[in-house]
Amino acid sequence: MKKILCLILAVLLMLSLCSCTLEDLLNIRSPKDYTLLGDAKLVVHFIDVGQGDSTLLESNGEFVLIDAGERDCGNTVVDYIESRGCDELKYIIATHPDSDHVGGLKTVIETIDAENFITSETDKSTSTWLNVLHAVDEYDINYIDAEAGETYSFGEASFTVLAPLSDSYNNYNNYSVVVKAECDDISFLLTGDAEKESEDQMLASGEDLSADVLKCGHHGSSSSTSDAFLSAVHPAFAIISCGENNDYGHPHRETVAKLTNRGIAYYRTDTLGTIVAATDGKGISILSHGGTQVEAETISKEDLNNGASASEAAFPYVGNKSSKVYHRYTCSGVKTMNDKNKIYFDTKEQAVQKGYAPCSLCNP
């Protein structure tokens, strides 16, 4: 019965997608309104769970959940998953046993059917983690020990495990299950809390780490996203999952500087809320759900391969909410602007319509 219901929901969703415009996507107000581009083959939802991590991948009616934030975020994640018309997860991936990643998984497992559970082996035995493992056993979910090189399919997409590459680390963050999700020409590298030690091992493995979208490790901490790793991934876009005014100072200024200096467009859940990336396998649209909207435009793989900066290609103009002045993306004034003050425009006309005046320095 569940599979029949899923099929009906999938058909209804596809019908709704056909009439959806980009303007519709930018005017969303709740998760259920994420009726995405009609030709999207893979949609990746970076769910806002505060200072934590939770990512939902969907393709052709099949779903993968990576982490679920702290324990008190379990219902938030469940509500979001169900709003996507999902009543069964093909895979749950627990990147590592830290509570800000796995705390909400017990609630997810108790509420939504799941086929497979993938994680790495550690000796961590907190009550939060043990409760998750007990739930996996109680609900008879197939347990899979993450092994680098293994590939799993869902819908029209797949993901490959790239890490961990050792069974012994001093820091639990480096046990993080790192996966590369792919759909035709577009790929996403999702790194959990993997830090430099794990990144160095991935670099040494010889695996292809390149990806169009990178979810920065450890909430944008300076302990992750090393220069060498960032060069190997060479992303057009980066996602940082962190909580507003968190106690750790995430994302760290070093990470933000690396992304900015390389022209990588980055998006933060603490300022944008839930962030959604949709791809048809040839291009990417980045959309936001929250207090601030991203002016989104689909960037083709061809443009990215030709060396276009994703930041400049998608959002050529950046406005300052305080001064009501808009700038070229490359203006020096943008580099010193507080992220929370930024609003993005893809045309000068949009900026003017919203009451923004041109910068006298860069003369956009």
Ranges and model annotations:
Residues H289-G290, E295-P364:
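Mature, structured domains enriched in cysteine- and short glycine motifs
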Residues V11, V177, K324:
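Residue-level detector of short, conserved catalytic/binding motifs and their immediate flanks
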Residues L9, L13-L17:
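Hydrophobic core
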Residues K2-I4, L17-A313, K335, S360:
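Non-globular, low-confidence helical/coil segments that flank catalytic cores
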Residues L7, T111, K354-G355:
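Generic alpha-helical secondary-structure signal
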